A protein has these predicted regions:
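Short, acidic/polar linear motifs in exposed loop/turn regions
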Residues: 61-64, 106, 183-189, 256
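Intrinsically disordered, low-complexity Pro/Gly/Ser/Thr-rich segments with frequent PxxP/GP/PP motifs
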Residues: 76-110, 203-237
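Bacterial signal peptide processing site
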Residues: 22-24
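C-terminal motif of bacterial Sec signal peptides marking the signal peptidase cleavage site
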Residues: 17-20
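Terminal connector regions
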Residues: 106-147, 234-269
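Beta-sheet-dominated interaction scaffolds and their linkers
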Residues: 27-57, 61-63, 146-178, 273, ...
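Short, hydrophobic/aromatic beta-strand segments
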Residues: 64-72, 111-112, 133-134, 188-198, ...
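Surface-exposed beta-loop interaction hotspot
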Residues: 125-209
Length: 286
């Protein structure tokens, strides 16, 4: 028995020693703090709006190049998208824009939400250092994100009650394109269109001048708003800069509440017809 106990003790001892000499601790993760002299802010160009994108404006106030592998906006106010590849080596610069898409706003049927804090997350390398994950805090509340959240959730509240779309009845009458916007019921509530704005290219003129311009009553499934479109500008430069030509702002209310704006975009075939009509009307060909 003593021999057995001694044998077991000798067998257990190396195991205990090995356990006590466990694997070395993993090295600490590199800090997520931004490099000194490198900062970001958010901006949006007109060309970004139709494609739901923003610019991460990077400032590098140092002489050390910084390589951005990818960039991502993270905030509870918008759905988080995967990191957007940047592959950008930035030397000293007062501002260099990195374009990224941003997710849909997280809206609520209860009303407009408040903006939540945001960060810009990037995988970057400073000089010859290894690539690391860095978190830039966006000053809160950011005015651009505040506007984007307000606009998108205002539209959400309207479209929860009714879809507002271009009808299929658009025809050219003389020098005017005539057709309608169609309101189609989705949920409860009286939806009233108070105004239809034009764009950089087109003047929108409601046929009926009384307010509201159209009303989708509580018991109705559909309503129409007769509309006329005419060219807003006829210079070639205007047609070359057509980034927002078809983003028509429609102001509407639900149950007599606050006016909110929803952007209504004609379908592609109608966009092509409107472009051809405007070019011809302006004497620019087409």
């Amino acid at each position: 028995m003593k021999r057995t106990a001694a044998f077991l003790a000798m067998a257990i001892l190396p195991i205990a020693l090995l356990a006590g000499c466990g694997a070395p601790e993993a090295p600490a993760a590199p800090p997520a703090d931004p490099p000194k002299g490198v900062s970001v802010s958010l901006a949006q160009w007109r060309s970004d709006e139709p494609v739901h994108a923003i610019e991460v404006a990077v400032t590098n106030a140092t002489d050390t190049p910084v390589y951005f592998s990818d960039v991502q906006l993270v905030t509870p106010s918008f759905k988080t998208l995967p990191p957007e590849r940047a592959d950008a080596l930035l030397k000293r610069t007062p501002r260099t824009d990195l374009r990224i898409p941003y997710g849909a706003a997280n809206c609520s049927p209860k009303g407009l939400p408040s903006l939540q804090p945001a960060t810009v997350v990037a995988h970057l390398r400073t000089g010859s250092e290894p690539l690391r994950r860095v978190v830039f805090k966006v000053p809160h509340p950011d005015p651009l994100l505040t506007r984007l959240l307000r606009d998108e959730c205002s539209a959400f509240l309207i479209t929860e009650a009714a879809d507002i779309e271009f009808g299929d009845d658009w025809t050219q009458v003389g020098k005017v394109m005539r057709g309608s916007l169609v309101l189609t019921r989705r949920s409860t509530g009286v939806v009233a269109v108070q105004d239809v704005g034009g764009t950089t290219h087109y003047i929108a003129t409601p046929v009926e001048k009384s307010r509201p311009l159209a009303t989708l009553d509580a018991g109705a499934q559909r309503a129409r708003l007769a509309l006329e479109l005419t060219p807003g500008r006829c210079d070639p430069h205007a047609f070359a800069e057509g980034k927002k030509a078809f983003l028509f702002p429609v102001r509407a209310t639900i149950d007599g509440g606050e006016e909110r704006v929803v952007i209504v975009v004609p379908p592609k075939p109608l966009q092509e017809r409107l472009t051809a009509y405007a070019l011809k009307t302006c004497g620019l060909g087409g």
